[in-house]
Amino acid sequence: MPPGPEVPVQVWVDGQLFQAEQSLLVEHCGFFRGLFRSGMREARAAEVRLGALSASGFRTALRVLRGERPALAAEDELLQAVECAAFLQAPALARFLEHSVTSDNCSLLCDAAAAFGLRDVLHSAALFIRDGSHELVAQLELPEARAYVAALRPSTYVAVSTHTPTPGFLEDASRTMCFLDEEEDAWRTLAALPLEASTLLAGVATLGNKLYIVGGVCGASKEVVELGFCYDPEGGTWCEFPSPHQPRYDMALAGFEGRLYAIGGEFQRTPMSSVECYDPATGCWSFVADLPQPATGVPCAQARGRLFVCLWRPADITAVVEYVVQMDKWLPVAELCRSQSYGHFMVAHRDSLYVVRNGPSDDFLHCAIDCLNLVTGQWTSLPGQFVNSKGALFTSVVRGDTVYTVNRVSTLVYAIEDGTWRLLREKAGFPRPGSLQTFLLRLPPGTTGPVATALPEL
């Protein structure tokens, strides 16, 4: 009989002995599931010899399966981890590698994943390369990896301004989404919003290269729009889907691990702490763990496959919390005491969260940016101040190693490097007034549209 789930299994790899729980190996590795179900002698003896793998690669695999997040910087470490993920058929290790892609390792991971048949890792690395510099493509060695990258589409910066439903016969230019045509330095119209859709105080997020809009309001009474709307750029089509069980507006909406999360928000002028999760496969919403406190308009960001929310507490405390799906809990991450006059925003890059906040009330047009290193838990402040005219920094979207921001005057692209944001280039401003929600979409080849018409200030 195979050993019980709590009996340790001895695994010899490259002359080194490892001990691991059978239940852990069976849960996470297709190789060990097949082995222990086979009744082979190694399984009965609770001793396995793996001659094809490296000891350091297997050690990394065990650490990841046990919930650790090892830093893999050396090329050998990355290659051995890819080899282990493929040989052991370990999805958790593959996901860890997907979330570890950076400009430093994307070409290596892309080649290795193509060689070992790890399609999800290949796809994540290739998407990163497609959005990066030409030098990243040049670093690829395998023709199949180069071909895979070439077949992908780059992501495009898209924006939608504040809009509330108007009678269908009225031509309302604000009822459109626009994308930045960087080659022509112009904002072009991508699609019109559905007549019933509102982006005023709505949650907007992307998931699986589709755009979702939830919880906009109409009128002075803030009547919540009853349906959600989903845009698919592949066909340029909209479809409707149910709203959360709890009507809400001014929420955070996040696409994370194949699901949408409607986080906090307000209803009938009452802030809420409840959170709901939407599964597009079933079309159903379900409640998950509440936030630690009621919150509206909370910034959220994803780093290394983790979902973070930034709360603002009395006495100028910024609190970062993380939602852990497996535990269905919000766990505290870090706090920082900083003064701000109104609003804050958050984006992620590699192991860092960047919290953008307005300065004190006498200088609210300037922003300070604080950086939380998720590995060390340390806060640092980016040198200097950043102008936040018309809320430009609150439209920040990270694409590779760059940050896109936009207001009516200009679109500014920053490079994230050497502990700061360095202005890289300037493009055309968004020609519409009002607050903006921004995101990235991969548009079909040849997508074009009329240049967005300028509208007067409200």
Curated annotation (Swiss-Prot):
Expressed in skeletal muscle, heart and lung. It comes from the Eukaryota. Signal peptide: none annotated. Pathway: Protein modification; protein ubiquitination. The BCB domain mediates the interaction with CUL3. Autoubiquitinated. This is Kelch repeat and BTB domain-containing protein 13. Its main location: cytoplasm. Substrate-specific adapter of a BCR (BTB-CUL3-RBX1) E3 ubiquitin ligase complex. It is found in: Cytoplasm. InterPro entries: BTB/POZ_dom, Kelch-BTB_domain-containing, Kelch-typ_b-propeller, Kelch_1, SKP1/BTB/POZ_sf. One of its GO terms (cellular component) is cytoplasm. Keywords: Cytoplasm, Kelch repeat, Repeat, Ubl conjugation, Ubl conjugation pathway. PANTHER family: KELCH REPEAT AND BTB DOMAIN-CONTAINING PROTEIN 13, KELCH REPEAT AND BTB DOMAIN-CONTAINING PROTEIN 13-RELATED. GO terms for molecular function: actin filament binding. One of its GO terms (biological process) is relaxation of skeletal muscle. It comes from Mus musculus. CDD domains: BACK_KBTBD13 (cd18486). Component of the BCR(KBTBD13) E3 ubiquitin ligase complex, at least composed of CUL3 and KBTBD13 and RBX1. Interacts with CUL3. The lineage of its organism: Eukaryota, Metazoa, Chordata, Craniata, Vertebrata. Gene3D superfamilies: Kelch-type beta propeller, Potassium Channel Kv1.1, Chain A. Kelch repeats lie at residues 159-209, 210-258, 259-305, 307-350, 352-400. Residues 7-74 form the BTB domain. It holds the Pfam family Kelch_1. The gene is Kbtbd13.
